[in-house]
Amino acid sequence: MAINFEELHPQEQAELERNIFFTTLEQIKGWARSNSLWPMTFGLACCAIEMMGVGSSHYDLDRFGSFFRTSPRQSDVMIVSGTVTKKMAPIVRRLYDQMPEPKWVIAMGSCATAGGPYVNSYAVVKGVDQIVPVDVYIPGCPPNPAALIYGINKLKEKIRYEAKTGKQVTNK
């Protein structure tokens, strides 16, 4: 059913222009997904201490619509913080596979992004992106809670952009 706006009174036209917007269902889903991220914490080292700081009252990640979950089946974001060893790699992959679609990964800290100071060890994975596809990298050793909030906001921008354009930013 089409609405003929020319037949309306000028005041009604002005009211409609202020209160009606047109969008696609994909953009609405992208907006909803980006504003209700539920990260699963996977803290393996000192970066996990900084991740706990984000949940405290000083930074309060809840105000951005993100609530930490302990189950991968209830999460859509995995935050990997710390050194991933080769023995731990299959567990990280299994948890990632248990997450429902759509799912995203944030690599927090230099250990998760590239192996950190333990990069030359035989037992350390040289970045979590060798196990799971990473969407956002947060550098630092350890990155502060504000950097994690910035990374989560960048992930939100990425989700909205992909919903708006239909293009994937990274190759998963």
Swiss-Prot record:
<keyword id="KW-1003">Cell membrane</keyword>
<keyword id="KW-0411">Iron-sulfur</keyword>
<dbReference type="GO" id="GO:0009060">
    <property type="term" value="P:aerobic respiration"/>
</dbReference>
<keyword id="KW-0472">Membrane</keyword>
<comment type="similarity">
    <text>Belongs to the complex I 20 kDa subunit family.</text>
</comment>
<dbReference type="GO" id="GO:0008137">
    <property type="term" value="F:NADH dehydrogenase (ubiquinone) activity"/>
</dbReference>
<feature type="binding site">
    <location>
        <position position="111"/>
    </location>
    <ligand>
        <name>[4Fe-4S] cluster</name>
    </ligand>
</feature>
<keyword id="KW-0004">4Fe-4S</keyword>
<feature type="binding site">
    <location>
        <position position="141"/>
    </location>
    <ligand>
        <name>[4Fe-4S] cluster</name>
    </ligand>
</feature>
<keyword id="KW-0408">Iron</keyword>
<protein>
    <recommendedName>
        <fullName>NADH-quinone oxidoreductase subunit B</fullName>
        <ecNumber>7.1.1.-</ecNumber>
    </recommendedName>
</protein>
<comment type="subunit">
    <text>NDH-1 is composed of 14 different subunits. Subunits NuoB, C, D, E, F, and G constitute the peripheral sector of the complex.</text>
</comment>
<dbReference type="InterPro" id="IPR006137">
    <property type="entry name" value="NADH_UbQ_OxRdtase-like_20kDa"/>
</dbReference>
<keyword id="KW-1278">Translocase</keyword>
<keyword id="KW-0479">Metal-binding</keyword>
<dbReference type="GO" id="GO:0045271">
    <property type="term" value="C:respiratory chain complex I"/>
</dbReference>
<dbReference type="GO" id="GO:0051539">
    <property type="term" value="F:4 iron, 4 sulfur cluster binding"/>
</dbReference>
<dbReference type="GO" id="GO:0005886">
    <property type="term" value="C:plasma membrane"/>
</dbReference>
<dbReference type="GO" id="GO:0050136">
    <property type="term" value="F:NADH:ubiquinone reductase (non-electrogenic) activity"/>
</dbReference>
<feature type="binding site">
    <location>
        <position position="47"/>
    </location>
    <ligand>
        <name>[4Fe-4S] cluster</name>
    </ligand>
</feature>
<keyword id="KW-0813">Transport</keyword>
<keyword id="KW-0874">Quinone</keyword>
<dbReference type="InterPro" id="IPR006138">
    <property type="entry name" value="NADH_UQ_OxRdtase_20Kd_su"/>
</dbReference>
<feature type="binding site">
    <location>
        <position position="46"/>
    </location>
    <ligand>
        <name>[4Fe-4S] cluster</name>
    </ligand>
</feature>
<dbReference type="GO" id="GO:0005506">
    <property type="term" value="F:iron ion binding"/>
</dbReference>
<dbReference type="GO" id="GO:0048038">
    <property type="term" value="F:quinone binding"/>
</dbReference>
<dbReference type="Pfam" id="PF01058">
    <property type="entry name" value="Oxidored_q6"/>
</dbReference>
<keyword id="KW-0520">NAD</keyword>
<dbReference type="GO" id="GO:0015990">
    <property type="term" value="P:electron transport coupled proton transport"/>
</dbReference>
<comment type="function">
    <text>NDH-1 shuttles electrons from NADH, via FMN and iron-sulfur (Fe-S) centers, to quinones in the respiratory chain. The immediate electron acceptor for the enzyme in this species is believed to be a menaquinone. Couples the redox reaction to proton translocation (for every two electrons transferred, four hydrogen ions are translocated across the cytoplasmic membrane), and thus conserves the redox energy in a proton gradient.</text>
</comment>
